[in-house]
């Protein structure tokens, strides 16, 4: 019975991961493609682009949007293997797709099972790297280990497993834009540290001005 269930889950993964087998396009996952605008992708997942999370605004605009396929999939469709998809945008364009697979849907599957399922979509892995961690700036680091990697000159696809939650995930990203985003995030953090003292001064002044305005108003209106 367990063997049948495991085979069924693998079939679901393969079906979801195999829109085309010829001329594998690493820059897409299911119906989502790197380089898509925030506005266009929001329409695809039925969300308001204004609800995207603002991560950093300077020196580059970094935003994220979370999509839960299980919540939106009709009950009549085949089982959904993905728990969550995190979309990352650089200056309004999708540069990274971070997928978290549902624990129940992947229960009992080995790392080789997952590699085989993903390979049905992206071809033979270019590297099997069980001891390599994802970059420290990645959402899943440092507790994730890459199992297999598919890549070309512009795109990297990484199948990983989290140590803490023991779940599988997939990260699809543009190498060039991911590097630009990482640099922008580091620079933004640096600017925030530099501006923190002045921001605190401004905050305290704003609170003091607000309190003084309330005091003056109440002085005029107070009756004992």
Language model features: what each stretch is:
Residues 1-9:
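Bacterial N-terminal signal peptides that target proteins for export
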Residues 9-19:
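Bacterial N-terminal signal peptides
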Residues 24-61, 101-224:
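Non-cytosolic coordination micro-motifs
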Residues 63-110:
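Mid-chain, structured segments of secreted extracytoplasmic proteins
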């Amino acid at each position: 019975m367990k063997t049948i269930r495991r085979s069924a889950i693998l079939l679901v993964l393969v079906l979801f991961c195999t829109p085309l087998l010829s001329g594998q396009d690493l820059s897409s996952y299911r119906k989502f493609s790197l380089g898509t605008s925030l506005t266009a992708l929001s329409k695809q997942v039925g969300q308001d682009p204004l609800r995207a999370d603002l991560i950093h605004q300077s020196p580059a605009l970094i935003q994220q949007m979370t999509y839960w396929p299980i919540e939106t999939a009709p009950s009549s469709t085949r089982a959904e293997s993905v728990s969550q998809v995190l979309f990352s945008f650089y200056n309004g364009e999708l540069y990274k797709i971070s997928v978290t697979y549902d624990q129940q849907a992947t229960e009992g599957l080995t790392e080789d099972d997952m590699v085989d399922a993903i390979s049905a979509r992206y071809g033979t892995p270019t590297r099997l790297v069980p001891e390599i961690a994802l970059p420290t700036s990645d959402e899943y680091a440092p507790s994730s280990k890459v199992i297999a990697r598919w890549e070309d000159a512009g795109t990297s696809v990484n199948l990983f497993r989290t140590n803490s939650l023991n779940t599988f995930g997939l990260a699809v990203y543009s190498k060039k834009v991911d590097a630009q985003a990482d640099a922008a995030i580091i620079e933004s953090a640096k600017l925030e540290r530099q501006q923190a003292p002045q921001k605190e001064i401004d905050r305290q002044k704003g609170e003091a001005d607000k309190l003084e305005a309330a005091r003056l108003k109440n002085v005029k209106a107070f009756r004992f």
